[in-house]
Amino acid sequence: MIQEEKEQYSSKSLEAGVDELWRASDAYALTRKKRLGSKRFFFVDGPPYTTGRIHLGTAWNKIIKDSVLRYRSMNGYDLIDRPGWDMHGLPIEVKVESILGFKTKKDIEEFGVARFTEECKKFAIGNMHEMTSQFKKLGVWMNWDDPYMTLKNEYIEAAWWTIKQAHEKHLLERGLRNVNWCPRCETAIADSEVEYADRKDDSIYVKFPLKNEEGFLVIWTTTPWTIPANMAVAANKDFTYAMVYALPAAVLEEAAMQAGLDHTTLVEHHSDGRPKPMRYSDKVAKMKEAIGEEKVKELYEKHGEKLIIARDLVDGVLKMGRYADYQVLKTMTGEELKGTEYVHPLADLIPCQKETEHKVYLADFVVGENTGMVHIAPGHGFDDFELGLKEGIRAYCPVKANGHYDDSVGAYAGMEIREANPKIMEDLRQRNLLLGATTIEHRYGHCWRCKTPIIFLTTDQWFIAVSKMKEDMLAEVKRVNWYPDWAGSARFYDWVNGARDWCVSRQRYWGIPIPIWKCEKCGSLDVIGTKEELERKVGREVPDLHRPFVDEVRLECECGGSMRRVEDIFDVWFDSAVASWATLHFPGRKDLMDWWPADFIVEGHDQTRGWFYSQLGAGMVGFGKAPYNGVCMHGFTLDETGKKMSKSLGNVVAPEDVVEKLGADTLRLYVLSQNAPWEDLSFSWEECGNINRAINIFWNVYRFPLPYMVLDKFDPAKVTLESVKGSLRVEDRWILSKLQAVIKDVDTYMATYELHRATRSIISFILEDLSRWYVQLARERTWVEADDPDKLAAYRVLYDTLVTTVKLIAPFTPYIAERMYQNLVRNVSAEAPVSVHMCDWPVVDSSLLDEQLNRDMDIARKIVEASSNARQKAKRKLRWPVQKIVVAAENPDVVTAVKDLSGVIGEQTNSKEVVVLAPGEANTELGVEVVPNPKLIGPIFKAVAGKVTAALKEADGRAVKKAIEEEKKYIVEIPEGSFDILLDMVSFRDVIPESLAMADFPGGKVYVDVTLSKELEAEGYTRELIRRIQDMRKEMNLNVEDRIKVEVYVGDEKVLDLVKSMKDYAAGEVRADTLDLKTEKPAAGFVKDWDVEGIPMTIGLEKI
């Protein structure tokens, strides 16, 4: 049978108990077993890196997934819900390097690759176990006994199979490409792995000497270290360029001083004598005047420099270079500038640059900024490399994997590139080729794992030719269902549209080895697709497919030569890219692929360029389609002010701290309901606390009827809804109808992954409909001692409402739902499903859904709220009854609602009578005040206007209004004569008497009669007395069924007499066998003094 819940809500003990229940009953396995063979729902988990403890964003991610999976399971779906773990790549390597104190790849080589990869494996597996425990404490149900792990051989085979497909479909290419490169990790990294942050860098303007004439091309760069690799200059064919003859400011200033120019003449003054800045152009004019035209000409011939700059940018560049004056010698188009030859500015220091031909090419990527020309180093830039391919420019890349120059750069050989910047700038300055230098702060790419600034290198890499599949990929993006739609139609579509060929090779150790063997003799390739294929070809078992073990495998080539595996491993994003078929154990098993593609994936919005993209690319390679049908994108978790959480800011909120303080259910319901999944979530302890209070209210609503049900031995198996149908009150029908509407809403929202709306709908139902309305209406019915049909109807409705609500909230707050279910259902029937999560999802019962009643009750509640507001104005507590309320309706819907629900409204407003006035019907209890219109009365009545106005104000407003409505006029009688008052000469204002209090609501006004009769006063004091006795019962920890005897001293004879008239009513309400009203204070039992509305009372209670 149902048990009473005596304890207050405690998340810690409740959740621990439910965890133990699930473990002991094997609830997860039984739940999944129940749905085997049903309609299918294939979910693929985006695998987190096993690099440490989970954070709030990871927790939110898994909570969303778990809630959707629980909902789908209750809706009858057979699920695939394997959790995934990303256990390879730089995320793991960098952590292990830090633990071991390594700084470079050389440290790893000296330590030993086998030992290093073993350390990585242990680190990844250890963290996986820790993170699994954390996820379980969030109530996440997944197939934790069989996760997919990217380090397992069967998973590695899924990646090998995919790359073999790429090879067979001519989508796998190797060649020189310009890639993002991390010099610390010494590997290529993908565009999606580049993290941008503000950084200060050198900003320099450099003069490149023309080869065949006097003058310079001027370029700008923020990477001085790329100057040694310069192979060309790019201009824009649509720009106009100018060759200017520029005179350095220092030369002109020195000549002016030698000419005897008094510097005081270079200062202007305000009218009051104060100095003011002189424009530099005016200073230049004065200096030239002082020097003389011939001398200026001589200065130009001796010191002038001929510079080629985009015409519109000349002034800015010359200001940067501190040139005082210039003349435009000629202009040219970009097309005319094409082919212009120049000499490398550091050719004397870099031997190979002496022998290289350098000239100007045209490129559309050159923009009208800085100088209008771009220095081209095909070895160190994507656009540069592409221009080099087009024009046949050599991709000279003198930088090694560790970010140091090689020996080909002469004077800079062996230097770290950024440490070489000052020397390069100084060498340019000594050659008078550094036009200007400063520093700028700009967004610059960094390695996603070690945070080192990236560089661009041209290296030999393995690529998947995304460019060959792009149109098909974009078509698939359109086919997939995106939640929200713009995540796919805008953000992801744009990313795919701009994507380059995918560099899938990495020069590291801990990852999936690229399964390509190359013949050392003839150079032919063999791409291996499975472990079995490799073992068949090598003739022995290969137990571990990682480095260095797989590196030791040699294959025999058809030419007789020996084939060695290429050293590279896969980009770690390629690991997770194959997750949707690796989850299904493919290619080892083919029978599960009819589940594919995934019905649902959900990850953060950063995955538009991460996992969403890599999966799409791999899916197109393997199967020619996207590996998912539905994608939901969620936001990031931020602090309360909207800032990113970071340890350095001290604003990190750990999920385990929230669980410890408020419970897993609170954290779950908070992150699900706070905002739409695709919006960023700014975590607030206060808002999270509000959700905890909502859960507490739900717990108390659940606890409320239990003592009465236990006392009355209520048996839901015997007291069915059908058996009490004839005793249902309108509020019973309403709460059941409202519940159907909530089921309908939740289903609608869950279909589009609007979990915030689904959870808010349930929370609102619990707080507003169930707790603050229905329970208040039903409370007194549960106190009836007799075996009353009305009470049983309330029990049954409460029971059904609670059980259904428990099922509705179960996917979102699984712990409290389970605890309530076990008491309300399992304690009633041992045949019921072991867990609430095994139950079928509630289905809308159309016979219970009454939309009109729902609308009427919404109106009734607004009327009750308005009545409460009016009472507050009159300082009349709700506990004190009023004779009546009058509802002045503004539309017919309000009239209908009041008539149909007058009993509910009367009970909730504590009024003896509820009166409704139809739209336009006058409230005769209101006074009517005449408001004369002076704009009409003055001009019409002129000299007597004041007396007419005074007469109107003194007249009976109701009579004036009636006369105008019926006779179209009202006649004012004054000594000067009779005057007709027409409708537009006056308006009317209601006058609320002191006996009424008024408040508005959407749909009309509510007037509360606050007149206090003797009978109402007696009831008011009696209700005050009852409340205090009930409080004392609670303090004595009495059970509902405990009987008491009461003695009451009332320190006012009048009030004593009033309470005596309702003594029997009070005794019944507090379950007192005797209630004696005395003139002396009680001494026996639990005695307490009270102040009741200014009247001293002393109450004594004794349990019988």
Swiss-Prot record:
UniProt cross-references to InterPro entries, sorted A to Z: aa-tRNA-synth_I_CS, aa-tRNA-synth_Ia, Anticodon_Ile_ABEc, Ile-tRNA-ligase, Ile-tRNA-ligase_type2, M/V/L/I-tRNA-synth_anticd-bd, Rossmann-like_a/b/a_fold, tRNAsynth_Ia_anticodon-bd
Motif ('HIGH' region): 48-58
One GO cellular component term: cytoplasm
Entry binding sites for ATP: K647
EC id: 6.1.1.5
Pfam families reported for this sequence: Anticodon_1, DUF5915, tRNA-synt_1
One GO term of the biological process aspect: isoleucyl-tRNA aminoacylation
Motif, 'KMSKS' region: chain positions: 644-648
PROSITE patterns associated with the record: AA_TRNA_LIGASE_I
Example of a GO MF term: aminoacyl-tRNA deacylase activity
The keyword ATP-binding is assigned to this record: yes
Enzyme class per UniProt: ligase
Signal peptide: none
Names of required cofactors: Zn(2+)
Location of this chain's protein in the cell: Cytoplasm
Domain description: IleRS has two distinct active sites: one for aminoacylation and one for editing. The misactivated valine is translocated from the active site to the editing site, which sterically excludes the correctly activated isoleucine. The single editing site contains two valyl binding pockets, one specific for each substrate (Val-AMP or Val-tRNA(Ile)).
Function according to Swiss-Prot or TrEMBL: Catalyzes the attachment of isoleucine to tRNA(Ile). As IleRS can inadvertently accommodate and process structurally similar amino acids such as valine, to avoid such errors it has two additional distinct tRNA(Ile)-dependent editing activities. One activity is designated as 'pretransfer' editing and involves the hydrolysis of activated Val-AMP. The other activity is designated 'posttransfer' editing and involves deacylation of mischarged Val-tRNA(Ile).
Protein name: Isoleucine--tRNA ligase
